[in-house]
């Protein structure tokens, strides 16, 4: 993308987004950075600027296997650039209601749940989700009572739970 090309010659290019967000993050409860599924410079910037990363995984065998590469990248970012970065959770997307997909979902929870928090939210594959990419509105406005909106609502509550845990300080617990 043009932004990634523009970052090539920038000093400390891995932390451009982090430096920008430092100036505005006090204005927000949460800042969510939604990135394309790649490991380019924009994703590296997002990881260097984040406290937590949520990992969406398509509910198929190969995508679940590829998740280990992203986990390795998160560990590298934590060691080299952002020691605060944690994996907030893994959630499954594009999950059709078939036995095969249910097996994938169960396998991800069983195999990765030992090492990573696997979120309860499972985002279904629906026509409505495909439609919103051209509708210029969220699934909550497009089909507020649909399966996808309910699943994303569950995900939002889980993300809020991560944020609430972060806000609790040891002094608050001791009281």
Where are the language model's segments positioned?
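C-terminal lobe/tail of nucleotide-utilizing enzymes
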Residues: 79-175
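P-loop/Walker-type NTP enzyme "switch/lid" segment
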Residues: 1-26, 81, 133-135
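Generic structural "secondary-structure junction" signal
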Residues: 5, 9, 41, 63-64, ...
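Conserved phosphate-coordination/catalytic loops
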Residues: 11-15, 68, 146
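Charged catalytic carboxylate motif
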Residues: 16, 69, 151-154
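Short amphipathic alpha-helical segments at helix-loop
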Residues: 2-5, 54-59, 140
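Conserved catalytic-core segment of NTP-binding enzymes
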Residues: 22-124
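Residue-level signal for well-ordered alpha-helical scaffold segments within enzymatic catalytic domains
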Residues: 19-23, 45, 154, 158
């Amino acid at each position: 993308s043009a932004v990634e090309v523009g970052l090539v010659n920038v000093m400390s290019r891995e932390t451009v987004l982090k430096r920008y967000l430092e100036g505005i993050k006090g204005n927000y409860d949460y800042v969510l950075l939604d990135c394309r599924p790649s490991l380019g410079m924009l994703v590296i910037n997002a990881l260097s600027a984040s406290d937590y990363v949520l990992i969406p995984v398509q509910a198929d065998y190969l995508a679940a296997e590829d998740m280990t590469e992203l986990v390795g990248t998160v560990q590298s970012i934590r060691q080299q650039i952002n020691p605060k970065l944690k994996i907030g959770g893994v959630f499954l997307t594009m999950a059709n209601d078939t036995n095969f997909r249910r097996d994938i979902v169960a396998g991800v929870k069983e195999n990765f749940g030992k090492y990573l928090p696997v979120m309860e939210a499972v985002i279904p594959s629906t026509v409505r989700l495909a439609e919103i990419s051209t509708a210029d509105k969220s699934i909550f406005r497009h089909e507020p009572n649909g399966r996808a909106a309910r699943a994303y609502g569950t995900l939002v509550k889980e993300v809020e739970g991560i944020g609430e845990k972060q806000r609790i300080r040891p002094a608050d617990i001791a009281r």
